[in-house]
Every structure is written in structure tokens, then in C-alpha cells.
């Protein structure tokens, strides 16, 4: 199984956050980051990357 690097995770999170922001606004994306104790993608704990990506991805494809 291939593991994404932290840089790959951050790039995916940032791209997905941009898509989610187009649909729901910056406040919705900020809410997701705040749930994980961050104000932006760079402030996230790497252990939360997959969870944050999953939430943002769901928003972006709704």
C-alpha cells in the first residue's frame, strides 16, 4: 500500500479546501480546520490529514 507524504497530503487538502470553499464559503472550510485545532492546512497535525481531507472531499463533491 502506498503512503502519501505529508507534502502530498497538504497539497490534496489545499486543493480540496479550495473546491469546498467555492461551494460553501471560507467559513465552512475554516470550521473544518478549527475542529482539528488549526486555522489553515499548515496548522494541522499530520495524524489528522486523512480525516480533514475526507471531510473537505465530502463537501467538495456534494
What do these predicted regions represent?
Residues 1-62:
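Interfaces that engage single-stranded nucleic acids at replication/repair/recombination sites
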Amino acid at each position: 500500500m502506498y503512503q502519501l507524504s505529508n507534502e502530498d497530503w497538504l497539497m490534496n487538502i489545499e486543493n480540496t479546501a479550495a473546491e469546498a470553499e467555492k461551494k460553501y464559503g471560507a467559513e465552512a472550510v475554516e470550521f473544518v480546520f478549527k475542529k482539528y485545532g488549526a486555522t489553515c492546512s499548515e496548522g494541522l497535525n499530520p495524524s489528522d490529514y486523512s480525516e480533514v481531507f475526507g471531510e473537505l472531499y465530502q463537501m467538495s463533491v456534494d
